[in-house]
């Protein structure tokens, strides 16, 4: 398919999804430096919050180095052309968090639910629209619903007021054909003026290929992270995506070399460990398990002596979804007992 002249909006995840491998402990200085680099490279939209969205600071998800207000308050005034977005998961983030983000100057709010639970987003989406925000419905773990099922969920979010809907491959489990099937079905069902987005993870090394497949099928907003910094094996690597788009004539407005420099000079040095497809991250993609479970499973391995891979496979078998991080410990204990009894 000839995509020359196609214009997309790339949405950076480095400072939100990238909080997962950083255990939410990014410093304000790191946030500001990377955000300014992204802004200068031409990235139009940058997400900033706790990895699990506004209000994510908790025992269950992890305590960040700073509050959402502090991170947003530090980054937003520095932006020359980029707008800032925030993620909100109903049940974690509240309408009060939404108000706070709006007051600080957040442009875009992304209201995220499991891909079968769009009905819990009505309050937050409708309120964000009342505030005049760019309002996105974000359907997570999209591999766990059929194209037809996703259509119904997307239409719900659209009816609440969302002006953009995301098909979100939280587990990095989808392949180009399964991405296309979902994006095409949702694109055909939504109003022409409603935008469509895709969020990929790199657990099966498909982040870039899936993003291009999504663009072919009608997505105009694409998530990626500099150096792939994100949960699991990371998000779609932004610098690779931008280079591929440039070769294909897809217009992003992002400087090919400046975004490489942000990844190499600013993001890689702050990594606590290399973002790569190790056996556990690969298992996330293979078994279709939520990306941010990775560090929790590695932690449980150290504590209970059960390989992280076994924990993740069992989590996939049980159909666990985002937000059930507490079940990782429970699963590890169950597997350890079963192993001891064998």
UniProtKB/Swiss-Prot annotation:
GO terms for biological process: catabolic process; L-leucine biosynthetic process. Mn(2+) binds at residues 17, 199, 201. Gene3D superfamilies: 1.10.8.60, Aldolase class I (3.20.20.70). The active site is at 20 (proton acceptor). Substrate binds at residues 16-17, 170, 199, 290. It catalyses: (S)-4-hydroxy-2-oxopentanoate = acetaldehyde + pyruvate. InterPro entries: 2-IPM_HCS-like, 4OH_2_O-val_aldolase, Aldolase_TIM, DmpG_comm, DRE_TIM_HOA, PYR_CT. The record marks 16 as: Transition state stabilizer. It comes from the Bacteria. Its EC number is 4.1.3.39. It holds the Pfam family HMGL-like. SUPFAM superfamilies: Aldolase, post-HMGL domain-like. Belongs to the 4-hydroxy-2-oxovalerate aldolase family. PANTHER family: 2-ISOPROPYLMALATE SYNTHASE 1, CHLOROPLASTIC-RELATED, HOMOCITRATE SYNTHASE-RELATED. This is 4-hydroxy-2-oxovalerate aldolase 2. It comes from Azoarcus sp. (strain BH72).
